[in-house]
From Swiss-Prot:
GO molecular function terms listed in the Swiss-Prot or TrEMBL record: ion channel inhibitor activity; sodium channel regulator activity; toxin activity
Keywords: Amidation, Disulfide bond, Ion channel impairing toxin, Knottin, Neurotoxin, Secreted, Signal, Toxin, Voltage-gated sodium channel impairing toxin
Tissue expression summary: Expressed by the venom gland.
Effect of residue 79 to W: No gain of activity against hNav1.7/SCN9A
Annotated consequence of substituting residue 54 to W: Low gain of inhibition activity against hNav1.7/SCN9A (IC(50)=2.7 uM), and gain of binding to anionic POPG liposome. Important gain of inhibition activity (IC(50)=440 nM), and gain of binding to anionic POPG liposome
Protein known as: Mu-theraphotoxin-Hhn2b 2
Disulphide linkage map: 50-65, 57-70, 64-77
Entry-annotated residues carrying Leucine amide: 81
């Protein structure tokens, strides 16, 4: 009788350990997925980053932020006037 109680208790402890390990892996998966999504968004933000006032630019490439235009003479972003 003592042996069967010991085996039952050991089985419950083993079940608890297995459940705890699988639950902790499930909790980490969404965190990893979210962090990968945000790193992809950060990368896209770097690709589409616009240039602000006074930054050098290439005329005709539309690199300046909205409200600014690349000046062909000076080759830097200036405030867009009259359009």
């Amino acid at each position: 009788m003592k042996a069967s109680m010991f085996l039952a208790l050991a089985g419950l402890v083993l079940l608890f350990v297995v459940c705890y390990a699988s639950e902790s892996e499930e909790k980490e998966f969404p965190r990893e997925l979210i962090s990968k999504i945000f790193t992809v968004d950060d990368f896209k933000g770097e690709e589409r980053e616009c240039k602000g006032f006074g930054k050098s630019c290439v005329p005709g490439k539309n690199e300046c932020c909205s409200g600014y235009a690349c000046n062909s003479r000076d080759k830097w972003c200036k405030v867009l006037l009259g359009k």
